[in-house]
């Protein structure tokens, strides 16, 4: 199933979809009991009853009938899902950076990230995931360092007072967008997003800084080689 944190929409979403499909089938069976002797069919979330009575019920009306009719009961759908494939999401990241030679300093100006996560179930949630992942990638590239005592092997970076991460004012102008596609294995065509947002950010930052400065970079964080200038903070779009 891939990384489990990234696969919640893909794995759980498919399980929920199967449970809903099972629920709709059980609603058909319940309506057959209520409308004894009639034929019941479901199509496009509407229920068609023919035979003794000719009725067309919306999903809401069908649910109400099943719940409150003396012959009805509470239908419960169930679904389980084991991934048959792990579809790959894709991302591309662009970074604009400045290099000030006299100060040996860098400033991030803009970050643009575009992703293919299939059909987004909730575009606002996906955008938030991307923005958070970009911030994590900025911290990884510029500041973050896990310090370990070479003798005791104990972690020295034990709190956020001494472990540098980006604040809101440290973030450059950030733009995110989604290219919609349809994955045949995902719930309603969706794929995972998760760590996808973080992965390309540090390489893009390093490439931008290398091209601006002409300095070869083989290690992170960049604060070991350069001073980090405040960003010209803009709105996230």
Model-predicted segments: where are they?
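C-terminal catalytic domains of large/alpha subunits in multi-subunit enzymes
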Residues: 1-237
């Amino acid at each position: 199933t891939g990384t489990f944190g990234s696969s919640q929409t893909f794995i759980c979403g498919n399980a929920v979809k199967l449970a809903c499909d099972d629920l709709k089938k059980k609603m058909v069976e319940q309506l057959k009991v209520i409308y004894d002797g009639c034929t019941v069919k479901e199509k496009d979330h509407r229920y068609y009853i023919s035979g003794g009575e000719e009725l067309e019920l919306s999903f809401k009306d069908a649910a109400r009938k099943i719940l409150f009719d003396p012959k009805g009961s509470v239908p419960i759908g169930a679904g389980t899902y084991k991934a048959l494939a792990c579809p790959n999401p894709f991302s591309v990241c662009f970074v604009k950076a400045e290099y000030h030679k006299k100060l040996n300093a860098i400033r991030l100006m803009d970050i643009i990230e575009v992703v293919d996560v299939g059909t987004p179930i909730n575009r606002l949630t996906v955008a938030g995931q991307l923005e958070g992942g970009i911030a994590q990638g900025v911290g990884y590239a510029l500041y973050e360092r896990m310090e370990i005592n070479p003798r005791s092997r104990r972690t020295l970076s034990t709190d956020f007072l001494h472990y540098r991460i980006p604040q809101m004012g440290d973030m450059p102008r950030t733009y995110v967008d989604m290219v919609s596609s349809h994955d045949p294995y995902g719930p309603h065509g969706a794929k995972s997003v998760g760590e996808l947002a973080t992965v390309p950010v540090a390489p893009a930052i390093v490439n931008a800084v290398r091209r601006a400065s002409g300095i070869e970079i083989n290690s992170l964080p960049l604060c070991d080689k350069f001073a980090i200038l405040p960003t010209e903070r803009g709105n996230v779009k």
